[in-house]
């Protein structure tokens, strides 16, 4: 897939689990009044932010459900929403081919049109305050052998040229606690990254600049 990255465009990428790449069309990409100036771009490594910026930022929300049969197949259920998408004439959310099925657009607002095209969601005329929700089956649970499993999510980024704008990510993972035990979450909780754990459920909330990738490790009981 071709993604413009010249001046006036911006690029948001996701990895295997959210597996989405959001490529905004070039024309008028920086005309949104809520779009931050280039001075706000962070060119350094991952940096967690202890508070949200004053202006609304892109909020990416993933809800993953691991079922008992996911351990054999690797397929998990994904519900995904995006709030405060940047205003652009066109964009697409693209999933890794062969790792997504049953992709659907469930709801959208402040977007003229949204439709499925292959393994992607195509967007047209994204306005300020846009919201998009979709669902799919994602092949994202990896069996690493000897009863261990990894769920890798990301990298998330809100990229502009060679730097990054602030982004908010919420990740919820539900898993069968009767057959899986949570071993570890990377990165660990810290200012700007909150993690809540209970048997069968994980909740993560991050505000950051840069590229964020998470890994959740399980052991089969």
PLM features: residue spans?
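Bacterial N-terminal signal peptides that target proteins for export
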Residues: 2-16
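Short, well-ordered beta-strand segments enriched in hydrophobic/aromatic residues
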Residues: 76-84
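N-terminal, polar/Ser/Thr-rich
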Residues: 30-69, 161
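Beta-strand-rich interaction surfaces with strong enrichment in secreted/lumenal proteins
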Residues: 64-69, 81-82, 120-126, 157-159, ...
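Surface-exposed, acidic/Ser/Thr-rich flexible loop segments
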Residues: 119-191
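Bacterial N-terminal signal peptides
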Residues: 14-25
């Amino acid at each position: 897939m071709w993604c413009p990255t010249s001046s006036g465009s911006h690029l948001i990428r996701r990895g295997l689990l959210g597996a989405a790449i959001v490529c905004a069309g070039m024309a008028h990409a920086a005309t949104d009044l809520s779009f931050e100036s280039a001075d706000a771009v962070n060119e350094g490594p991952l940096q967690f932010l202890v508070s949200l910026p004053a202006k609304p930022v892109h909020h990416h929300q993933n809800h993953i459900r691991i079922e008992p049969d996911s351990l054999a197949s690797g397929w998990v259920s994904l519900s995904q929403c995006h709030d405060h998408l940047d205003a652009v004439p066109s964009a697409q959310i693209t999933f890794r081919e062969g790792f997504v099925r049953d992709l659907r657009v469930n709801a959208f607002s402040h977007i003229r049109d949204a439709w499925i095209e292959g393994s992607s969601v195509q967007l047209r005329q994204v306005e300020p305050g846009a919201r998009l929700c979709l669902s799919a089956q994602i092949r994202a649970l990896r069996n690493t052998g000897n009863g261990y499993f990894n769920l890798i999510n990301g990298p998330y980024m809100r990229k502009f040229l060679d730097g990054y704008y602030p982004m908010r990510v919420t990740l919820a993972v539900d898993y069968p606690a009767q057959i899986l035990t949570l071993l570890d979450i990377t990165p660990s909780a810290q200012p700007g990254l909150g993690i809540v754990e209970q048997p069968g459920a994980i909740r993560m909330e991050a505000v950051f600049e840069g590229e964020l990738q998470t890994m959740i490790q399980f052991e089969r009981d």
